Amino acid sequence: MRYRLGVDVGGTFTDVLLLEETTGTTFRAKTPSTPADQSIGVLNGIAKVCAEAEIEPSEIGQVLHGTTVATNAILQGRGARVGLVTTDGFRQVLQIARSFVPGGLAGWIIWPKPEPLAALENTVEVVGRLAADGSEITPLDEEQARAQLRRLAGAGIEALTISLINSYANDAHEKQVAAWAESELPGIPISISSQVLPEMREYERTLTTVANSYVQPEVSRYVRNLDRSLQEKGITAPLSILRSDGGLVQSAKAAESPVSLLLSGPAGGVTGAVWFAEQAGYTDFLTFDMGGTSTDVALVLGGEPRIGRETKVGDLAVRATSVDVRTVGAGGGSIAHVPELTKALRVGPQSAGADPGPAAYGNGGTEPTVTDANVVLGYLPAALAGGEVSLDVDASRTAVATIADAIGLGSPEEAASGIVDIVNENMFGALRLVSVQQGYDPRDFALVSFGGAGPLHANALGRLTGAWPVIVPPSPGVLCAYGDATTCVRDESARTMIRAFSDTDDAELRTALAELATSAAARLSAEGVPTEQQTAKYQVDLRYQGQGFEIPVDLDASALESGDLLSTLGAAFDTEHERLFSFLLKNEREVINLRVTVSGPRPDVAFQPLEEGGEDPSAALVSTNDVWMDGEYAKAGIYDRAKLLAGNVVEGPAVITEMDSTTLVLSGHAATVHSSASLLIAPR
């Protein structure tokens, strides 16, 4: 037997899923996250799931991990002290930045500008200059450059970024400075912009490379520690890390380019959602991943997640390929509060996290959270995670009652209903960002819900968006780990090539794209993926001449082989531009960047359809419970999901429980069990 182990570390829980490839049998575990050292929670989960499966850790063939280490380093300001080497005259590139201030009309008054990840006192200039076409204008001055590097060594930097003007067109100067840095700053990790982001725009290229340096020591330490701990537990399987774009990369390479891991965790959920939605027969859908701290949403079209060229974490926005995920601070642990000034109920973004957690957990938490509201409303059973977490209903009522008192409501139930309504609206706003604001009508999509808290709110989100059916995969609380275990190895090559359509031809574009594909394929082959099992996807960034931004246009292999490449690109660009902005221009089109992603094969995981059982779900009925719905109490059936069979129809109001999550079916709706074991919720 061959086992694949998927691991996803969240803000509250660490999810582990063990998958036996030949039968599709899964074993799962959910353990509290350990923020001080994430590897502790990971190892606890692995030990637990191996014991459940009755296997030795040495039988695991692959370990596939979605991590938030890089993300947390950015959010918590725990990154390295970064030194930055720039071209003479560009020392303040990070301070000048871009003329964008968030927060509306008066944002510039109240917005606290974040400090750059590389301080000005740790930024030096070197003499030497390249032109935009890569030709040398001024040669490097070795003596001056070494003196500047020695200055950084004396400043005690922990990581070094080298970002020189126009290095995307010629990396010779950056490589030379890196060679000198290796002798002047031994042991210091070095990131050069022509490798991290070989594209135009010096600010974005510099910022992205500095971010890579900022998180590199932290990620490297974590990967080394986890690798060593796995070895000590008898797991000799290779460790792979999930990239932000949903592909896997070997741990050593991930440590070299950690900026590609900033959305590693959310990408795993989207990848898992694609797998289960395909089994249920849906390829166009929105994803809704609600955990304990935050909610991530994305859009999938034709079975492919939309990929963005910007990754945003907190105030930091870097140019890195990632699944186009939007995040809001709304989770099961989000704290409800009533500001003294406005007396208006708010929910989040503050979270009770894993420690102390919601009041219902009985770990000392006293503030009212979304989880407490669901407990008060009767939507959550008395125990979570298969009975491992008991809920304190009285503590939840006491916590939520403080909200009722603060805003003058008559009962904790009314306050709890208000908390749930507000958090649902917050998440609805995030879903609009990836659908309506991108030119898509959510009513044309299904909605795939997962995460520990997602299925509790999924039916309500379906009602708000009009996206039907709402699909709740099996084991939704560990779906991110399932995505980690069912995705493929991936690599990417990119290049800036600024050409007006009239200044290039099909042959030049085809040659450049082929070179990028060859480069990425070679790196994938080095990781053990046979060439015949590799597939390439092509993307070209286009704009009208004079525009200050580009639109990525996907290009399939058949179009690349056809003789009318520019016409195909132009037509696709016009379609996308009109969808986004509702107009076209007569300006000439212009090629800006080329990008090729090469992927290995998806794992061949067996699928076993669920046994047929007819429409009657009564064999899975465990009990009934009073739930507060539509302003009054109603009787709801409590169902054990493990006992539901294909074809069963659960009519709301109902609560469907399982080890890692709970699904709420509202009045006037019904959940049909699909043969893939997913629940399909729709209005009756």
Question: Predicted regions: what is each one?
Answer:
Residues 1-83, 131, 138-161, 174-179, ...:
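N-terminal glycine/serine-rich phosphate-binding loop of ATP-dependent small-molecule kinases
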Residues 16, 28-36, 83-89, 251, ...:
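Glycine-rich phosphate-binding loop of actin/hexokinase-like ATP-binding domains
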Residues 61-62, 161-170, 212-215, 416-421, ...:
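Conserved short loop/turn motifs at secondary-structure junctions
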